[in-house]
Amino acid sequence: MARYLGPKCKLSRREGTDLFLKSGVKANDEKCKMNTAPGQHGARRARLSDYGLQLREKQKVRRMYGVLEGQFKKYYVEANRRKGNTGATLLEILESRLDNVVYRMGFAATRAEARQLVVHKGIMLNGHTCNVPSAQVKAGDVVAVREKSKKQLRIQNAIELAKHRKELSWIDVNTDSLEGTMKSSPDRSELSADINEQLIIELYSK
């Protein structure tokens, strides 16, 4: 499945909620008609079956984190293999992706921008350049912006935007040196309450 390159608002409108795909300079409800689906008949949202609700939730989370279907299914298999709550573990795996951690630390305004920063070798993981967005960051790992990338205007803008976001207990960030430490595994209680991971588990469990 190819990566979607179309309008970001269209994806958020399809799911009926902000997927945080845009920078946040301006409220998404001002930029996107969030209360209507895209298309000619967007004003009328179809009533979904149980399967439809499960599928929409999976698509919403997959798009939110910018993960393709094959990779997302692998994350579910891994989460199901581990001990504990499968849904919470799935979100923990998604949150531990390097591109997401870069976004959470405020070095990028969106996850897509964070992914690009990683791919273009602008990020270091434990002192070594890492250009793999899906690399799993563990507790104690240090993520930093490479020296030659620190003066990029988009990174400076992202840092300013991040000041308006809620601080997370599981990461510690130094905005002067542009590096941060993942102190512990991501805490489900600090993640989006708009995600119903149980619907995703029910979908894949069939």
Swiss-Prot record:
GO terms for cellular component: small ribosomal subunit. InterPro entries: Ribosomal_uS4 (IPR022801), Ribosomal_uS4_bac-type (IPR005709), Ribosomal_uS4_CS (IPR018079), Ribosomal_uS4_N (IPR001912), S4_RNA-bd (IPR002942), S4_RNA-bd_sf (IPR036986). GO terms for biological process: ribosomal small subunit biogenesis; translation. Coiled coil: none annotated. Residues 96-156 form the S4 RNA-binding domain. SUPFAM superfamilies: Alpha-L RNA-binding motif. Pfam families: Ribosomal_S4 (PF00163), S4 (PF01479). The keyword GTP-binding does not apply. GO terms for molecular function: rRNA binding; structural constituent of ribosome. It comes from the Bacteria. Keywords: Ribonucleoprotein, Ribosomal protein, RNA-binding, rRNA-binding. One of the primary rRNA binding proteins, it binds directly to 16S rRNA where it nucleates assembly of the body of the 30S subunit. NCBIfam families: PRK05327.1, rpsD_bact. Part of the 30S ribosomal subunit. Contacts protein S5. The interaction surface between S4 and S5 is involved in control of translational fidelity. Belongs to the universal ribosomal protein uS4 family. This is Small ribosomal subunit protein uS4.
